[in-house]
Structures are given as structure tokens and as C-alpha cells.
Amino acid sequence: MKISYEDLLYLFEHDRDHVDETRFYFDDDPEEDEHYIGYIPEVKGEIVDKPYWIGYCDIDGGCEFKTAKELFEAKVFNGKSIKERWEHVILLEIGGYDADAESWHEKILSNRKRIDE
């Protein structure tokens, strides 16, 4: 069961405790290179201006963003964004947890319902 784009974006916007590091690849990439995205609000006790980050993309050394939306819409994966390439995204881990685990999807959805209430 694949998490929807909307649910993953929601998780990055509202339940940041579980997205410090997320691994994925694109199934239309013959090399299947892994990419990383995440959220780190502080470094050495200092609040960071751009807590959202991407590693292993078109920009050497990765890049940082103020919002999750900016991260998901950044055209840094062969000139396209995660949003544009979503149908080819294969999530491996979300916050260190197996992205395919049924319990993980239930947790995401239950957290979303709780936060929305």
C-alpha cells in the first residue's frame, strides 16, 4: 500500500517528529539512485531558518527549504519535483520506518485525523 502524495505532504507539514529522514527512489530511473528528504528544526540547539532538506538531487550537497510545500515542489530531480514525479516515487523508509508497513500507514492516517480534529 503506497501512501498518497497528500498524506506524505501532510505528514511533513504537521507530524514532523516522524520525518527526520525519508528515503526513496524513482522507478523510472534506471540506476534507482536513492534520494533523501527530511526535517531538522534545530542544529546544535539553534533553530534553523530552512528546516526541510533534500539530499542527493540535482544540486551538489543538497538543498534546504522553509516549508514542506517548497521541498515537494522543488524541481531538483532531473529538473522535476517530487510532486511532478509522484507516480514514480518508491518510498523505502519514512523517518527510519519501513514505508510499506501497514501499521505505519495506519499511524499516519490516525495522526492526521487526530491533528485535524
What do these predicted regions represent?
Residues M1-I3, E32, C63:
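Residue-level signal for well-ordered alpha-helical segments
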Residues M1, V43, D49, S110-R112:
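Generic cytosolic/nucleocytoplasmic N-terminal low-complexity/intrinsically disordered segments
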Residues G61-E117:
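Mixed-charge, Lys/Arg-enriched low-complexity segments
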Residues D17-D58:
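Amphipathic, interaction-prone secondary-structure segments
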Residues Y10, D29-E31, P41-K44, C57, ...:
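Short linear sequence elements within intrinsically disordered, low-complexity coil regions
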Residues M1-D27:
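Negatively charged, low-complexity tracts enriched in Asp/Glu with abundant Ser/Thr
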Residues L9-R16, I37-E46, K69-F77:
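A short, sequence-level motif marking secondary-structure junctions
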